[in-house]
């Protein structure tokens, strides 16, 4: 594997671990019965399955045939509590249908609800009280994917997070790997009183650790095709765009199904072909699951050809699984950019939300590209030449232009010419430290790279923490391959041996360093809380904001008054801080808000403390602590969207500046000065 390929697929060793069934390394694809058939029948499902094969949709990736509600009997359980298929609609039973699908190279999906069955008032079946039993039954039926609705859960006013966690655990114990999709559709659109925890827009907080995918909003349409559907496409798309940072390989935001060209009773279409294509394009740009809701037997040859377009599908299936984000907007629409695998490549959508054709422009600098940029039209599968600065095209009403741009990544600072596989750190004086291509700790100083190995099996995990002090001394703290903390010291012109600091860490440590005899090491423990230790003390817990597990690596700094500041990425991808005064007393946790896609970085500069974090749209933002308070978020304009991965490494520079290092989108380590 080429070094840049290694770099692009590497990530920081984050905590907690994201869910990964192994069944969806890229967004899954298929067809679901709900919007196309309503209550399905065995005969119709087999007919659609055959059409998926004959139309080429299966070979394009649409390989899951997913039964939604209505497959179950009117009384969904037998005397032993087992789920039962409707004998009139599925006379051969579910296992026979699964076998039929498997023989045709298709996978089988099924539906249940996470709540308790209430006799049909809210849902047609419910698995609460039967999670283990139902998961085993689905496994015995050789089901490949499960959709878990929450209609009866909503009716009972349950908190979906704990319920879905129980169901996820049941699937893990079932003896069969099955893709898990969570479908809590409750939003304010329902007009029902509910807590924030019960809202679909909150699912991203817990779902990435327990499921392959999760709905990010309410249903995109009614079961019966209806006029005025275009605003609902935009509504679900915009809701899905709120938390792109929650998505990654094996775990995906789900804005609901594709509903191309469903025909209404008057013979007209719910969505035009252009609107249907715009939905398909935007779902691909967001790296969403591509599940058809329309009946493919009713689609025109031209619509089917669009849905099979290999260049559009390739954007959705890009192995980085980055969700494209908005990088520019105006009164007519938006520009979205998505980083693709390989250097200098972006997928860009020019969306026209308006009711009239409009000239739409992408400025290459908004995508982090410079130099001559090659433009390819993915919808037309045609090259559009090489351009400098920008590209403009007319886009129809409710339409899209879908482009692949290939140019040079433009990143702030100086390329150090070395590849990192996690976020780097920097010491005063300029030496950079990072996890190299082979997993070992590497030092880059004075133009030379030196491999420092690692404490266990020659490797480290995640971002190192470093501090330079008087006499040329450098202290380095790392998480070893055994998840313990280690320290190594450079003094008197040579590196000493690794020293174990114990602990069991879920992410790399950071250090609040006063001098070699006075420091506090902080990390995320295996229980998701922040843990600390000093030179002589053992590990102890600082808890976590709201008693919910934190993501990633805490950051720490000591200010000019000797206070220790700690910042973490919370469960809701917001930033929280707390501080320890010179008497050793810790404050409570304080929310700084924000929505971040990487661990925060703290650095003390003069009388202030600066906090940097990569935002949800992959840009860099900062806060300043001065006069006893944090001053609010501001954007660093020198960092375009997706310029870097993970977290900055930072140290105080001259005249109030910050010297920073980061792992660029190309996998290289860069050094820059932030003023």
Protein language model features and the residues they cover:
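N-terminal module-boundary/linker segments of secreted carbohydrate-active enzymes
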Residues: 2-46, 51, 178, 187, ...
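Structural recognition of the beta-strand scaffold that forms the well-ordered cores
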Residues: 27-33, 61-68, 107-112, 144-149, ...
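Aromatic-lined carbohydrate-binding/catalytic grooves of carbohydrate-active enzymes
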Residues: 48, 52-157
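Glycan-recognition surfaces
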Residues: 130, 179-295
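Catalytic cores of secreted or luminal carbohydrate-active enzymes
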Residues: 281-326, 400-408
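Carbohydrate-binding surface patches
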Residues: 283-286, 291-293, 329-369
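C-terminal beta-strand-rich structural cap/linker in extracellular carbohydrate-active enzymes
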Residues: 387-411
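A structural motif
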Residues: 409-675
């Amino acid at each position: 594997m080429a070094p840049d390929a290694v770099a692009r697929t590497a990530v920081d060793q984050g905590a907690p671990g994201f869910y990964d069934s192994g069944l969806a390394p890229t967004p899954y694809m298929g067809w679901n019965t709900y919007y196309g058939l309503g209550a399905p029948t065995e005969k119709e499902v087999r007919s659609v399955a055959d059409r998926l094969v004959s139309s080429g949709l299966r070979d394009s990736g649409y390989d899951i045939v997913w039964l939604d509600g209505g497959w179950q009997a009117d009384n969904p359980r037998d005397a032993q509590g087992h789920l039962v298929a409707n004998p009139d609609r599925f006379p051969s039973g579910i296992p026979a249908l699964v076998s039929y699908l498997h023989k045709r190279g298709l996978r089988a999906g099924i539906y249940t609800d996470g709540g308790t069955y209430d006799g049909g008032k809210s849902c047609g079946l419910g698995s609460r009280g039967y999670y283990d039993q139902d998961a085993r039954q689905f496994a015995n039926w050789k089901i490949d994917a499960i959709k878990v609705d929450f209609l009866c859960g909503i009716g009972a006013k349950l908190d979906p997070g704990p319920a879905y966690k129980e169901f996820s655990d049941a699937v893990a114990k079932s003896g069969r790997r099955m893709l898990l999709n969570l479908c809590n559709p409750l939003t304010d659109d329902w007009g029902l009183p509910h807590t924030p925890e019960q809202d679909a827009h909150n699912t991203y907080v817990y779902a990435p650790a327990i499921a392959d995918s999760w709905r990010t909003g309410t249903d995109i349409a009614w079961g019966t095709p209806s006029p005025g559907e275009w605003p609902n496409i935009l509504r679900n798309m915009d809701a899905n765009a709120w938390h792109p940072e929650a998505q990654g390989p094996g775990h995906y935001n789900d804005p609901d199904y594709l509903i191309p060209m469903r025909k209404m009773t008057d013979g007209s279409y719910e969505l035009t072909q252009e609107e249907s294509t715009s939905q398909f394009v935007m779902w691909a740009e967001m790296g969403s699951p591509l599940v058809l809701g329309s009946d493919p037997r009713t689609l025109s040859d031209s619509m089917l050809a669009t849905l099979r377009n290999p260049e559009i599908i390739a954007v959705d299936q890009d192995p980085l699984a980055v969700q494209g984000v908005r990088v520019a907007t105006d009164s007519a629409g938006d520009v979205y950019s998505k980083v693709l695998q390989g250097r200098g490549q972006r997928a860009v959508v020019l969306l026209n939300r308006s009711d009239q054709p409009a000239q739409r422009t992408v400025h290459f600098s908004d995508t982090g590209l410079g130099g001559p940029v090659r433009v390819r039209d993915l919808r037309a599968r045609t090259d559009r030449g090489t351009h400098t600065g920008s590209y403009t095209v007319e886009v129809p009403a409710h339409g899209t232009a879908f482009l692949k741009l290939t140019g040079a990544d433009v990143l702030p600072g100086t390329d150090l010419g070395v590849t990192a596989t996690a976020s780097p750190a920097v010491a005063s004086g300029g030496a950079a430290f990072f996890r190299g291509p082979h997993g070992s700790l590497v030092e880059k100083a004075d133009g030379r790279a030196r491999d420092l190995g690692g404490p266990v099996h020659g490797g480290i995990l995640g971002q190192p923490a470093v501090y330079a002090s008087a006499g040329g001394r450098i202290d380095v703290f790392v998480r070893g391959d055994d998840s313990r903390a280690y320290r190594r010291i450079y003094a008197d012109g040579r590196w000493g041996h690794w020293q174990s600091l114990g602990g069991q860490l879920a992410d790399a440590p950071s250090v609040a360093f006063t001098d070699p005899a006075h420091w506090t090491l902080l990390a995320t423990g295996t229980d998701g809380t922040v843990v600390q230790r000093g030179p002589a003390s053992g590990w102890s817990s600082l808890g976590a904001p709201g008693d919910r597990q934190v993501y990633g690596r805490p950051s720490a700094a000591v200010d000019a008054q000797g206070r220790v500041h700690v910042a973490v990425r919370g469960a809701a991808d917001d930033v929280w801080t707390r501080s320890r005064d010179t008497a050793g007393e810790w404050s409570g946790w304080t929310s700084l808000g924000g929505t971040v896609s990487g661990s925060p970085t703290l650095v003390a500069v003069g009388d202030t403390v600066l906090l940097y974090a990569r935002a949800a749209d992959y840009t860099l933002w900062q806060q300043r602590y001065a006069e006893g308070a944090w001053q609010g978020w501001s954007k660093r304009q020198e960092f375009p969207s997706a310029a870097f991965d993970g977290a900055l490494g930072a140290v105080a520079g001259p005249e109030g500046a910050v010297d920073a290092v980061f792992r660029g989108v190309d996998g290289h380590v860069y050094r820059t000065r932030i003023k």
